[in-house]
Amino acid sequence: MAIETLVKTIFSDEFRKERWEDLNAGKLLDPQFKKDMKFGDEVDVQFHDPLTMNDYEGGDLDISTVEKAGTSTVKVKINKGKSIFFKLDEAKLDQIKNAKTDNEKIKLVKEYSADAREQFDRAINKACCEQRIRATMLENNRAITISDTNVHQVFASAKTALVKGDGKGHTAWKDGEMIAVISPEMEAFMSTMKILQYSDVMAKHYKKGFVGMFMGFAVVVDNNIDKTTEVVSGENVTYEYPLFGRAKRTIAGGVQKDFKLESGKKVGGFDTHYWGKGVFGVKAPLSYLLVSAKCLVKFTIGS
């Protein structure tokens, strides 16, 4: 197989794989890969219904008394995209060509094209962070100035809201599957307080971004946490919005499956250039499944 063809094939195969463990905020996403998607399309995505709890007052239960559970269809607008460009110089191409085994060639291709895929992953993470506008806001949308004395209260309030759910018997909480997505600054507060409990099991499960457990949440750090800037008393103040929800059960997503790379060399050039584009869309279909808070986080030495 020609090296250019090998690069395109391996990259496309990697792109189609679900990279859930390599996402940060995207761990809240249930991504479904779709073929033949275009920017601006609206696609049907199957989304898992929430858990249901009802009062039990005695007697037998049968199918007529059980509320339907399973999946529901969510309309997701494909309104996000990322163009991808990378190049391989002759030295890298020769290294791939001269690899002793096919597995070594594949490993090198993955290594040299990894940054392009990571850029797409970051775009998905950012889109998930932006879904905080659908979240149930804590403290009536008033800003909470994070300190070492109240950071635990944000988690407690988020947990309470998720357990309560919609107040009609649907809860958004399930032990062992809850995620908190926070900024590096908020993690700094929690780390200095030594309240994060590390878990080898959870670290292997969640992988990228995982920093520990707290109050039933697997805490994941994301640099792209959503932020807004407001003028307060004549000064610009930046607020950030941590997210709290259930892994793979909070945000619905449609992601392009049939990603195709093009390749070519510039006139007179030696490097092989690769380019392509991928589209996707995300949506938090039920606001009570996602909780956020408007936080002012300023970590300094001595905080």
Task: Show where each model-derived region lies.
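Glycine-rich, flexible loop segments associated with nucleotide phosphate handling
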Residues: T101-E111, H170-M178, F210, N236-L243
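Active-site-surrounding "flap" and adjacent substrate/cofactor-binding loops of secreted or lumenal enzymes
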Residues: P50, G58-S72
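Generic alpha-helix structural propensity
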Residues: G40, D55, A69-T71, G81, ...
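Short regulatory "switch" loops immediately downstream of catalytic or recognition motifs
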Residues: A91-K97, T160-G165, D222-E230
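Short acidic, glycine/tyrosine-flanked loop/strand segments centered on an H-E-D-like triad
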Residues: S72-D102
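Sequence/fold signature of self-assembling virion shell proteins
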Residues: A2-L29, D36-F39, D44-M53, K77-N79, ...
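Alpha-helical scaffold segments that mediate packing/assembly in large oligomeric complexes
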Residues: K97-K168, V297-S303
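Extended, solvent-exposed, turn-rich assembly/linker loops in the middle of proteins
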Residues: T136-F210
